């Protein structure tokens, strides 16, 4: 079983010899919850990331930090810019990926992922970044701009459900995680279909968007978004195959070693 999910999930992840992966285990009453902090890290083996095994490869990255990320404030579709740390995270990601010759680039149409992509591509400024509306962050509706403590005062049950059963929550005047998954997966599928042999594509988006895409690749429901970690500036690598019988493979998930640590400290729950 793959973290209690269908056993065919093992075909969609990659674990190399002597690589390391980290799982966060939490206990509540008599049950346990598992969160994937990272998978198949190889930087300690003098390899920034595993060798490509597919016909093309996508580098999926979460945008750099904003002040609202730092404060733990729900930002959603409010277009908060990168703060100085977020710009530094993007620069460190550029350095980590310096030897990658991207020939395609995609971004959420919001500014924080677009600015992150621009910094990563600073040596390849002629490459056009396609901005995609369907990859914008989840709309938190009336929660946007609020701290979790403020939301707990007004919507305590809904906030608890967001943490425990996110698939059952529709944000007040906002979206559900199902809405995000449907639009994000549709956009990602189009990106995958556009890939040609040996394409190396950059895709910069958001926490909820990235998590729903990864859930879809793993073949698990979007209700499992909290099982996936996506740190600001974290890198996830997806290998794609021309053979329709071969599913995409997550060759590495949430690489953050280039940012100064293995464990990321992004605020939990605030997207």
Predicted regions and their residues:
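Acidic, low-complexity terminal tails and accessory targeting/binding regions
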Residues: 2-61, 70, 96, 141-150, ...
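Phosphate-coordination/substrate-recognition cap region in phosphate-metabolizing enzymes
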Residues: 4, 21, 33, 91-160
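Short, conserved phosphate/pyrophosphate- and ester-handling motifs at nucleotide-, phospho-/glycolipid
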Residues: 63, 86, 206
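Loop-to-helix element that buttresses phosphate recognition and phosphoryl-transfer chemistry
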Residues: 67-123, 154, 167-186
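Phosphate-handling substructures
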Residues: 80-81, 122-185, 249-252, 264, ...
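His/acidic metal-ligating clusters that form di-metal
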Residues: 195, 203-208
